[in-house]
């Protein structure tokens, strides 16, 4: 499989070439801006003064002054932070560059049969008769970058590729010609200042033109060889006319193909949840029905006019080969990049609303299914009710503390002490209601008079899903119960979505563990599950019955109240109405939007598969080896006393399907011996695959991010796809970053931040210098730069005004009083900060903060000399300090063996994993394993953050006592905690979690490597000198990551030794007390917490 080899110079060099490419006309001057260490501050001031003398300065004069500066300041004492471009005259007009591509290869718009008008890619004025009807909602790419920029970036990428890979450049050029020609034919869609495409631009162009240009360019950027070229070509051409079903059609054969690889050796999960190699060998087998399904899918593709893709699928189907399976996986991943399918909500929910109810169902099965749900819920909650769990007793407080800032369904104008705010946010409504004594936990009706407003969720290759936006009372009613159920699911392996510690690798080892030639793996996609109408009545009724049984287990009034409102929420939703096109329409199904959606679906899904398997047991003799539910999907392995034959498999599959249909559940049930495909991952031939389907030039919905933030998202998405086997041109990605991070100052003046800003961990970080690994620049220069950057604080007047308002103050006070017996400053600060942070999702506040930060950054990038440094200790300081007493002793070449558990990973990562081994569990990065956290959890609904826990255990014994006392922790427990000096253990545990957090061990590739691998003992030579376990831990972890980084960057394994004395350890330990975390758009997008 082709991996694109990055012949990547430096970002700064690339950016310079890009600017020359864009500003390809006479009247341009470039000015480089530098940052230098404090002792050369004067030289920078001098340089800036000398070039700002006259009005218009020539390039030669700038260059001359720059040379003087560079001669005076040594290279290690300075770095380039930005380029300022003065461009007089016409911008390197994209349209002029496109002209040379002609119109010969242009595509033509044509309506599709059976598609709604707006889903056709036809001339906009044929869909919307006039301006007043027009909306861009169904084609809006929702990203702050334009078709022009994307074309510019693609043309530049091609011109760069011609220098080192002429053959592939020709492929890209051929594909780009189709796009350029089509743009020449219809005209370039020009966006307004908010990157929206308006009626004037679109009226005489095909409606989906902009979205098509974006997704096509994205697909071109993925082309690395003939195979990817052919896929991209076919999808680009076909997606111009088919805007509805293409992705679904192209990806549906996959379900059958995953079952067609034999297993020849695989990794399995052992009893102690580790992966080990097993040399089991299983031949594949598929039923006649599956083969027919496959041929049917291929026929549909050909009817749609596709050639290469169906031919390739069919050829592979006739002679399956593990070595070419990654090519099949590529088609599967590519299909998502045709973009989102955005439907009108009325069309999206039409199916769900018009579900026909059948009385002709198997009542026996229904009864069993219903009882299973009821018993499961009863079992989960029983002990918690008997022991009067804090979360149930204080259900209301618990819910208020974790009240999200999602929409409450109605727009209100709220006056926060003079600051007027128009918002739909739940948290703001609650604060306001409590202040005005309008707050109540009574569940409002959702009947024909108060229908539920709908939100939307768009996914490539599927229909748009509707989301209920319920009043916050529903959240309060369901929160505690749902949390308890989720916690229970964390300990039950059947719930693979929630099972704790498990990452996807573990779930994979679970499947391969039980497979053999006597076993059938059945997997079912229950995607219509939510909409199946009677299923819902039955679900809600079972929940209510379980709740009524639970109520008899306790006399606690508060818990009775909690159960009552929970039951009320179920009864209301059982017969709910939704608001579509200003009409209220009856709808009884489960819809996402409730707190319990995910966990209830899983519980019901498990009950469903158990019921169906139970019914099958009356026909066959088999053992159920495992059952797993994961969201909409369920899969199970059943072992027979005899070897599976094609006849048995076929019979079994059709029986499985018929039992599902006896319950009138519309599902796609399949069975195989060696592989399965569910929404999140697929297993084939004993190997694990993920779909690389994250869109890069399209977003699902518009949010309040600036283009700068979106550049960070773009990079993070590129990394996710690369780790899943879809490599995009890195040149293209860096070019997009260069465009999207640039800041327009005036019409003629643009500022481009450079790598030293964009790749340094500060609030402005966007990408990593080396893909897959995080580098923390550590030199005196970069630490000074980082300190200056961290002094740029984001402020928001609106947020400050709200925080000062009587409403906000009294709300925080209320939470405080309800939580603690006597006011504890640490807790009240924690609450106030959390509540204030929730305000950030309110658009005007987020915008105000970012704008403020950017305007300061712009002046910094032009003249860094006037800025004060902030004295903060960051992870860089720590690593800089450690770098002083370690040395690299030797390095050997990383062995060529690759770990093939996940064949689609980049080769260098597979080699690294083969050497160090795969990680099967996550590290505690929240401090939840510490005793202090556990004690508070037992007696209170408050969850302190890691910073707060850290602060507490480092305080005096009396302060710790006071902290516990304010949560009503019994004296006996506190005494035990203090007398056994548990806080010393906690210091270590919490700091450990904090360090894991700081070093981002759950980022990208790091989450795959076993950081506790015994291999590291050979490469980190460290004999600790002092009794400072935290410092030792910090050094060890930092060096392990250093070794991994080196493997990825250089393909070498280094051996590092530590030469520290006692004072070094103590100094490091003290430093660790004060380390602060850095948040940036980069970290927001790249860290996977849970």
From Swiss-Prot:
Co-factor(s): Mg(2+)
Residues covered by the RdRp catalytic domain: 506-678
Keyword RNA-binding set for record: yes
Catalytic reaction equation(s): RNA(n) + a ribonucleoside 5'-triphosphate = RNA(n+1) + diphosphate
Compartment(s) where it occurs, according to its Swiss-Prot or TrEMBL record: Virion
Classification via Gene3D superfamilies: 1.10.357.80, 1.20.120.1390, 1.20.120.1400, 3.30.70.2480, Viral RNA-directed RNA polymerase, 4-helical domain (1.10.10.1990)
Record-listed E.C. numbers: 2.7.7.48
UniProt main location, coarse: virion
GO CC terms of this entry: virion component
Keywords for this protein: Magnesium, Nucleotide-binding, Nucleotidyltransferase, RNA-binding, RNA-directed RNA polymerase, Transferase, Viral RNA replication, Virion
Superkingdom to which the source organism belongs: Viruses
Self-association state and partner proteins as the record states: Interacts with VP3 (Potential). Interacts with VP2; this interaction activates VP1. Interacts with NSP5; this interaction is probably necessary for the formation of functional virus factories. Interacts with NSP2; this interaction is weak.
Name by which UniProt lists this protein: RNA-directed RNA polymerase
Lineage: Viruses, Riboviria, Orthornavirae, Duplornaviricota, Resentoviricetes
